[in-house]
Amino acid sequence: MGKSAQFPFHVWLPDSMEGPTPISALIHAATMVTAGIFMVARLSPLYELSETALSVMVIVGAISALFLGLVAMVQTDIKRIVAYSTLSQLGYMVVALGASAYSAAVFHLMTHAFFKALLFLAVGSVILGMHHDQDIRNMGGLGKYMPWTYATALIGSLALVGVPFFSGFYSKESIINAIRVSSVTGATVALIAVGIGLFVTGFYTFRLFFYVFHGRERFQRQQ
């Protein structure tokens, strides 16, 4: 739980976002926090021997997926929004592990690594264009100034939300189907939490997208 930054051991990850954004794209999206998910998947025969361990994973993962998504909804720092989004998506993977759907967890781990790295790099481009201002309240209307960044951020956002025909749709669907048929204690509550979490994901993702790329310009132009 601590390695994958799950509730209540999640407080360290947002503060680790202070480094360069390309490093965050590599470490946070594809390697560091996802190592805990991969470790549990590799040790699946051990976890299958304990019904209690599986139940704890389902419940903790569901809480993380929903609660940390709600936290992302109220953030104003662009990198922290993406950081809490990562924690929320890791919650989906933990739920899949608790439901013994190890292939679904690793599938979402792989798809998430690609579209979250894409989002991190888009965020880095925005921060550079804003002269290192990371407050989304100071942005707006950047779509016409950064068309390539706009396009990549849109693709990453659609995949994160789980729009059909994007990778996130298929991996999230496999997790939801796994928890729906699971008999582990807490599976029903987890299914409800994950279902609500899907709408929360859409809200904070497009809140970020429209705050940054659409609307009126809230920044001062610099030469």
Walk through the language-model features, giving the residues of each.
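Hydrophobic transmembrane alpha-helices and their helix-loop junctions in integral membrane proteins
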Residues: 1-223
